[in-house]
């Protein structure tokens, strides 16, 4: 048991501690930056100084520091996070490492992402679930290409809060002049980032512990908060709840003949019993009869809550459909523009079919054209015939059916999708919807002979289904 938990248990008792812990807000954040900027050391210092390390973990770090550490006689706190043997031996981070800790004010999930360019896909994966990015800058080196790259990817993936931590201030004698020089350079670069971003820039030393949890005497000239104070006070819960109601249906829950509910997690906004809702892409409407949770029925539910909704009308809803408020303006389209992060050796090629999964909906799609590829070192763009591993580009997609979706910046759950290779079933890329384009009508040439024959058999043997004649429909 670590000392912080032990102290809280002594003060509150086990029931009081669990109750307090249950209602703490949760912040997911990632650390990113260039190679050897000290990301893993920073997380280790954060855990150590907030008393979140168990005694056996600390003993193991002391032991390993003698063998593979890089800090001389001091314990190498980066070893708390770099868990893979290859990472420890090379002194770098390869995979995305997750760590969990809590303070008296908040719970945290940390994603420690790799800094090397060839692991850009790992960093994008880590950023996709986070609310805030801690971007480390080496005080000796200043803003590097990788700093710009990770800032751009974090911005692309919808993160609105950035903490730029200028690390290794101990190696520049805690120079205020050097801090201000790097701060101005980063702020100038950040003008190119999309949307409204909240950027906080702080100096610190992860190795010595200055301004990580406590302010420290060496940075007395800095009047802002420490890193932990920033993380404890940033408001992300309000932002999640203020959007329009979006509820992707994950499962039709029918435990008996008397109950039919639609299970899922509310992506944004809120819903109340009695609200008029609309199912997309069908457009059929109803009203909410009950909101069922694990703890029983509630009258209202907000973003992030897993619920089962029952409706007053029996309308056709299945997995992959999207429930919104009746007056919501949501587009259903089979033609869209999206930023794509490519994650496999075989490049993305226009015209090739891929499985697309978006908010529980699975369909098939292909890239019509790659509008441009981003140079993520300077945010410029250039033409590209295909998208290579770790490449990011703006692509025009066509899907086999209409899908209800939002812009990714408005709602990540209903505006983000993954791209799956149809032969290997491997996830090969991730997409972020930028805008819906005019729907593409399928021509007769796009319909196979098998589909036409099946359509004719359905109309012949199941006339009560009232299926339309495909051959006649496509001639119009």
UniProtKB/Swiss-Prot annotation:
Ranges for domain tr-type G: 24-239
Subunit structure: Heterodimer composed of CysD, the smaller subunit, and CysN.
Annotated region described as G3, given as residue ranges: 112-115
Assigned keywords, A-Z: ATP-binding, GTP-binding, Nucleotide-binding, Nucleotidyltransferase, Transferase
Region annotated G5, chain positions: 205-207
UniProt pathway: Sulfur metabolism; hydrogen sulfide biosynthesis; sulfite from sulfate: step 1/3
Region G2, residue ranges: 91-95
Species classification: Bacteria, Pseudomonadati, Pseudomonadota, Gammaproteobacteria, Vibrionales
Family named by the database record: Belongs to the TRAFAC class translation factor GTPase superfamily. Classic translation factor GTPase family. CysN/NodQ subfamily.
Residue ranges of the region described as G1: 33-40
Record-given protein name: Sulfate adenylyltransferase subunit 1
Described purpose of this protein according to its UniProt entry: With CysD forms the ATP sulfurylase (ATPS) that catalyzes the adenylation of sulfate producing adenosine 5'-phosphosulfate (APS) and diphosphate, the first enzymatic step in sulfur assimilation pathway. APS synthesis involves the formation of a high-energy phosphoric-sulfuric acid anhydride bond driven by GTP hydrolysis by CysN coupled to ATP hydrolysis by CysD.
G4: annotated segments: 167-170
């Amino acid at each position: 048991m670590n000392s912080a938990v032990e102290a809280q248990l002594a003060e509150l008792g086990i029931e009081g501690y669990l109750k307090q812990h249950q209602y703490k807000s949760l912040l997911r954040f990632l650390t990113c930056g260039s190679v050897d900027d000290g990301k893993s050391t920073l997380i280790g210092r954060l855990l150590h100084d907030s008393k979140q390390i168990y005694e056996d973990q600390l003993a193991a770090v002391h032991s390993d520091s003698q063998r593979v550490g890089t800090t001389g006689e001091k314990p190498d706190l980066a070893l708390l996070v770099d868990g893979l043997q290859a990472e420890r031996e090379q002194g770098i981070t390869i995979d995305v490492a997750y760590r969990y800790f809590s303070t008296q004010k908040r719970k945290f999930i940390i994603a420690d992402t790799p800094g090397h360019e060839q692991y850009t896909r790992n960093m994008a994966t880590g950023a996709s679930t986070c609310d805030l990015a801690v971007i480390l800058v080496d005080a000796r080196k200043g803003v590097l290409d990788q700093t710009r790259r990770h800032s751009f990817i974090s911005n692309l993936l919808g993160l609105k809060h950035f903490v730029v931590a200028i690390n290794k201030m101990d190696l520049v004698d805690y120079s205020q002049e050097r801090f201000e020089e790097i701060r101005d350079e980063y702020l100038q670069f950040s003008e190119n980032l999309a949307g409204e971003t909240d950027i906080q820039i702080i100096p610190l030393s992860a190795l010595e512990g200055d301004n990580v949890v406590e302010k420290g005497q060496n940075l007395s000239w800095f009047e802002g908060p420490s890193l932990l104070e920033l993380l404890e006070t940033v408001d992300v819960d309000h932002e999640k709840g203020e959007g329009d109601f979006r509820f992707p249906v994950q499962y039709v829950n029918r435990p008996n003949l008397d109950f039919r509910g639609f299970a899922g997690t509310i992506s944004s906004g809120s819903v109340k019993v009695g609200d008029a809702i609309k199912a997309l892409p069908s457009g059929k409407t109803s009203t909410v009869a009950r909101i069922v949770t694990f703890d029983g029925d509630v009258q209202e539910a907000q973003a992030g809550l897993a619920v089962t909704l029952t409706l007053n009308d029996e309308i056709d809803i299945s997995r992959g459909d999207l429930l919104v408020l009746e007056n919501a303006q949501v587009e259903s389209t089979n033609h869209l523009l999206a930023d794509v992060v490519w994650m496999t050796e075989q490049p993305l090629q226009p015209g090739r079919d891929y499985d697309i999964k978006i908010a529980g909906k699975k369909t098939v799609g292909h890239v019509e054209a790659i509008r441009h590829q981003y140079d993520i070192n300077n945010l410029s763009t250039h033409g590209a015939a295909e998208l290579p591993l770790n490449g990011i580009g703006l692509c025009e997609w066509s899907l086999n059916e209409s899908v209800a979706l939002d812009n990714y910046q408005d709602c990540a759950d209903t505006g983000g999708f993954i791209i799956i290779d149809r032969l290997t079933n491997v996830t090969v890329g991730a997409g972020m919807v930028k805008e819906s384009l005019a729907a593409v009508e399928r021509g007769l040439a796009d319909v196979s002979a098998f589909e036409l024959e099946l359509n004719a058999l359905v109309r012949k043997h199941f006339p009560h289904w009232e299926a339309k004649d495909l051959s006649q429909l496509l001639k119009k």
